Amino acid sequence: MSATATLPAVRGKLTPQAPLAPLVWFKSGGAADWLFEPKDVDDLADFLRDLDPAIPVMALGLGSNLIVRDGGFPGVVVRLGKAFAKVEPIDATTLRCGGGASGILVSSTARDAGIAGMEFLRSIPGTVGGFVRMNGGAYGGEVKDILVDCDVVLRSGERKTLALADLGYTYRHSELPEGAVVVGATFRGRPGASAAIQAEMDRISASREASQPLRSRTGGSTFKNPAGHKAWQLVDAAGCRGLMVGGAQVSEKHTNFLINTGDATSADIEALGEEVRRRVKDKSGIELQWEIQRVGKAE
């Protein structure tokens, strides 16, 4: 797809050859052919309906769980802005959340409304759209535990509300169709005291700060935990703590995190991940699966 291709008219913002490195946590990777920031759901649905179906579409949240390859993304990247970031209680235990709302906003709104069970979202560095797509989870909670339903715009531009059962959730995976964009979700918790909810959020924050390289350029958890194992322990046992490829390094603080030490390319980061997978397979016989999404084309 060329940046001169004719795209449907929009009311939001459409940027050709948009650099993606500033928008992802690793701060590496190439440009998107187009970056689309829709004004509202109608704008998004109309655009996808009229867009050539051969053009790939990818939703981008906070860019935390993502490697964008150095050749960029050959298609349209959709980024939901403030119009999609609202969170509001709809009853004593239920929140209605926009697809662009952060986990921090959802969990703090739940706290203020006295809704427990969503504290774990405080620790997920992403948006509702991202963690609904991948059944995000941490600290004993997963999206499947709180999701009632979600609103999506399919690649065809059709709008649909999908119930929890429609998503086919497994560990860090859903059956959400390719090119679909999650524009909203309904989460249900349980009644709780705001002070106790805040205390649990504080505990989670302190645990993350102590154990994860939060101030580094990282993508979050790199590999899924295999059944009965912790990925970080397998990586450590294979001698990969501190291992480097180019400017990419396995974190000394938490071995299931890769970090960009300053000048890493996405190729460095992905190659490091593959080298870790190879060493773990050689050491333990276990084949680690990527949790981080890798998209786009190599340079």
Swiss-Prot record:
Residue ranges of the FAD-binding PCMH-type domain?
A: 27-192
What UniProt keywords are attached to this protein's entry?
A: Cell cycle, Cell division, Cell shape, Cell wall biogenesis/degradation, Cytoplasm, FAD, Flavoprotein, NADP, Oxidoreductase, Peptidoglycan synthesis
Under the heading SUPFAM superfamilies, the entry gives:
FAD-binding/transporter-associated domain-like (SSF56176), Uridine diphospho-N-Acetylenolpyruvylglucosamine reductase, MurB, C-terminal domain (SSF56194)
Q: Where does it sit, as one GO cellular component term?
A: cytosol
Where do the record's region annotations for Disordered lie?
A: 206-225
Cofactor(s) needed by this chain: FAD
Location of the protein in the cell: Cytoplasm
Name any Gene Ontology BP term: peptidoglycan biosynthetic process
Residue ranges annotated as transmembrane are none
Compositionally biased spans, kind Polar residues: 208-224
Task: Reply yes or no: does the keyword Transmembrane apply.
Answer: no
Q: Which Gene3D superfamilies match?
A: 3.30.465.10, UDP-N-acetylenolpyruvoylglucosamine reductase, C-terminal domain (3.90.78.10), Uridine Diphospho-n-acetylenolpyruvylglucosamine Reductase, domain 2 (3.30.43.10)
Q: Please state the Enzyme Commission number of this protein.
A: 1.3.1.98
What is the similarity comment for this entry? Belongs to the MurB family.
Q: What is this protein called?
A: UDP-N-acetylenolpyruvoylglucosamine reductase
**Source organism per UniProt:** Sphingopyxis alaskensis (strain DSM 13593 / LMG 18877 / RB2256) (Sphingomonas alaskensis)
